[in-house]
Structures are given as structure tokens and as C-alpha cells.
């Protein structure tokens, strides 16, 4: 840096310091002089303070209203995207000591077979799984024999058809996914084997979905080929209402209302998704009983056996 530039920087710095000192002295002198408008200033300050308080109150109210509107908008958009939150129904098999209603499972299988099986598959369920749960072995064999299964190859290397057996899975309604989408306007009917586990709040969701069809509210337009259902994400579903009063004639004579059919088919689907539930609960109680006995035995030995050994003192008597 040149000498002239250093000198200019020094003068600039000195000038700034001088202006700062002069300004501070002037402010101190002004503060000592009495003002002619003190009363007016005091009144204006009070008015400004009241106005600022009112402004802050209005700002707080506006922020609260804006927050409520934002929350309502977010809740509405979330409801439209994910569907309504399903109510909780008192399913009889959800208790700790409860088991499945096997009569309801049998009726639910009847509803699935006559209403749902034309579009939805249950690829993980075999006919033998129904034995002892909803049907006897003879009834299940007769039911399986009603279907035809493509098997093979035979000794000549050709495929053949045969009557169904207990080891066969439930038949598929469509040959492949493309055929299923073509038959349902582009929508793919999901497999129902694990549907109550694959959906959030599964049992309640399936029941609410099956029984909540209604006309769309004012201002909501549904594309042709879709149906309004508030519990389905987006509110528009390709599946029409399938459960109508009297759609199925139960073998035990119970009236087949919409709610009854929905309850029964959900019981059947819950069993299909978790057939080991009853065995798991029973095994849990067995383990609790065994571990309780082990805990009591450990407490006994800890209190009456080990405490004696733990508190024992050994005295070493050294004989000279």
C-alpha cells in the first residue's frame, strides 16, 4: 500500500472519530435542556402505547384465525387423500381371553364365496384350512370337489383337469393381472388373504368401506365408472356396493342384513389373515403360567435358601 493511501485512510478514520464524539456531546446537551412539548409528547406516547397494544391484539387474533383455517385446510386435504378415519367397532375376537366366532367365520366364507370371489382372490388359503374352523372334513371335501383344477403333466406330458382336493388353494377369478384390470375398468381387485393386515386399522377399515356407500355430497363430482365412498382414499372407488340386504341366504337362518354380512365377512378375513391367533393366545397363557411357577420357585430359593448361605460367616480359627 502506498504512503499517500495510508495517509488518506488515517484522515478518514480521524474524521469518523471526531464526528462520533461531536454527535454524542450534542445528544447529551439536548437531553439536559427542557422540552417545550413534554406534555404533548407524553400524550402521544400514551396514545401510541395503546395503539400498539390494540395492534398486537389484532395481530394475535388474526394469527389464531389463520392457524385455524390452515389446520382445517390441512385436515380436509388429508381426509380427501387418505379417507375418513374409521370408527372402532367391538370385534368379539379382540379380547385377551376371546376367540373367533366360528359360526360368523362360516357365514363370512359364504359371503365371500357368493359375493366377493367373482373379483377378489385369496391365493394363500387352502380348502384344508377350513377344516375344523368353519366346516367338517366331509363338507370341505365336497366343496373342493366342485372346482376343476388344471394339473399335470401326466405320463403323456399333457396337462389335464381334475376335481379339487383339500390341498388346493382357492381358485383365482382371473388368469392374470392384465385380465383382472381389463374386466374392472383398469382397477386391480386386491388379494384378500391378508387384507385386514395390509390396511391401516384393517378390520374397521374393511367393514366401514363395505357399508359406507352413499351419494356424493354437493360439490363433489365422481367420474363415470367410479362410486363415492368417504373411507376410500380419494373418495372414489371402482368397486360398486356389493352388500345389499338379502344378497345372501344364510344356512342358519340369520337375516342377511348389510351390517351382518359386513361383520361376518370381516370375521372370515380376520381369521384368514391370522389363523394362528387362538393358538398364540393359548400358548401365551401357558408360558405365563410356567414362568410364574419359575418365578415363585426362584423367589423361594432366594428367600429361604440362598439368603442363609449369603449371610453365613466363616470364622478361621488358627491353631498355633
UniProtKB/Swiss-Prot annotation:
PROSITE patterns: CYTC. Residues 78-280 are mitochondrial intermembrane. Its EC number is 7.1.1.8. Keywords: Electron transport, Heme, Iron, Membrane, Metal-binding, Mitochondrion, Mitochondrion inner membrane, Respiratory chain, Transit peptide, Translocase, Transmembrane, Transmembrane helix, Transport. It is found in: Mitochondrion inner membrane. The chain crosses the membrane at residues 281-301. GO terms for cellular component: mitochondrial inner membrane. Residues 103-210 form the Cytochrome c domain. In all tissues analyzed. GO terms for molecular function: heme binding; metal ion binding; ubiquinol-cytochrome-c reductase activity. Residues 1-77 form a transit peptide. It catalyses: a quinol + 2 Fe(III)-[cytochrome c](out) = a quinone + 2 Fe(II)-[cytochrome c](out) + 2 H(+)(out). It is an enzyme of class 7 (translocase). Its cofactor is heme c. Binds 1 heme c group covalently per subunit. Heme c binds at residues 116, 119-120, 239. Pfam families: Cytochrom_C1. Residues 302-320 are mitochondrial matrix. It is a single-pass membrane protein. The keyword Transport applies. Component of the ubiquinol-cytochrome c oxidoreductase, a multisubunit transmembrane complex that is part of the mitochondrial electron transport chain which drives oxidative phosphorylation. Belongs to the cytochrome c family. Component of the ubiquinol-cytochrome c oxidoreductase (cytochrome b-c1 complex, complex III, CIII), a multisubunit enzyme composed of 3 respiratory subunits cytochrome b, cytochrome c1 and Rieske protein, 2 core protein subunits, and additional low-molecular weight protein subunits. The complex exists as an obligatory dimer and forms supercomplexes (SCs) in the inner mitochondrial membrane with cytochrome c oxidase (complex IV, CIV). PANTHER family: CYTOCHROME C1 (PTHR10266), CYTOCHROME C1, HEME PROTEIN, MITOCHONDRIAL (PTHR10266:SF3). This is Cytochrome c1-1, heme protein, mitochondrial.
Amino acid at each position: 500500500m502506498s504512503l499517500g493511501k495510508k495517509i488518506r485512510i488515517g484522515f478518514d478514520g480521524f474524521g469518523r472519530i471526531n464526528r462520533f464524539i461531536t454527535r454524542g456531546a450534542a445528544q447529551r446537551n439536548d437531553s439536559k435542556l427542557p422540552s417545550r412539548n413534554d406534555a404533548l409528547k407524553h400524550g402521544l406516547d400514551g396514545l401510541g402505547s395503546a395503539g400498539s397494544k390494540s395492534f398486537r391484539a389484532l395481530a394475535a387474533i388474526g394469527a389464531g384465525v389463520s392457524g385455524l383455517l390452515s389446520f382445517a385446510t390441512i385436515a380436509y386435504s388429508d381426509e380427501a387423500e387418505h379417507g375418513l378415519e374409521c370408527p372402532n367397532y367391538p370385534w368379539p375376537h379382540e379380547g385377551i381371553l376371546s376367540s373367533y366366532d366360528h359360526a360368523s367365520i362360516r357365514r363370512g366364507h359364504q359371503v365371500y364365496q357368493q359375493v366377493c370371489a367373482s373379483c377378489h382372490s385369496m391365493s394363500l388359503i387352502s380348502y384344508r384350512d377350513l377344516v375344523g374352523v368353519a366346516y367338517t372334513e366331509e363338507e370341505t371335501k365336497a366343496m373342493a370337489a366342485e372346482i376343476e383344477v388344471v394339473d399335470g403333466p401326466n405320463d403323456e406330458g399333457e396337462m389335464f383337469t381334475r376335481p379339487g382336493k383339500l390341498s388346493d388353494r382357492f381358485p383365482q377369478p382371473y388368469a392374470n393381472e392384465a385380465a383382472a384390470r381389463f374386466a374392472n375398468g383398469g382397477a386391480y381387485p386386491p388379494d384378500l388373504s391378508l387384507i385386514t393386515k395390509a390396511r391401516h386399522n384393517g378390520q374397521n377399515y374393511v367393514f366401514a368401506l363395505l357399508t359406507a356407500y352413499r351419494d356424493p355430497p354437493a360439490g363433489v363430482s365422481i367420474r363415470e365408472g367410479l362410486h363415492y365412498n368417504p373411507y376410500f382414499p380419494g373418495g372414489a372407488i371402482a368397486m360398486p356396493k356389493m352388500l345389499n340386504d338379502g344378497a345372501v341366504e344364510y344356512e342358519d337362518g340369520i337375516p342377511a342384513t348389510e351390517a351382518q354380512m359386513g361383520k361376518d365377512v370381516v370375521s372370515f378375513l380376520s381369521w384368514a389373515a391370522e389363523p394362528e391367533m387362538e393358538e398364540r393366545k393359548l400358548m401365551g397363557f401357558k408360558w405365563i403360567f410356567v414362568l410364574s411357577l419359575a418365578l415363585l420357585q426362584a423367589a423361594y430359593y432366594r428367600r429361604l435358601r440362598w439368603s442363609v448361605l449369603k449371610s453365613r460367616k466363616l470364622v478361621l480359627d488358627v491353631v498355633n
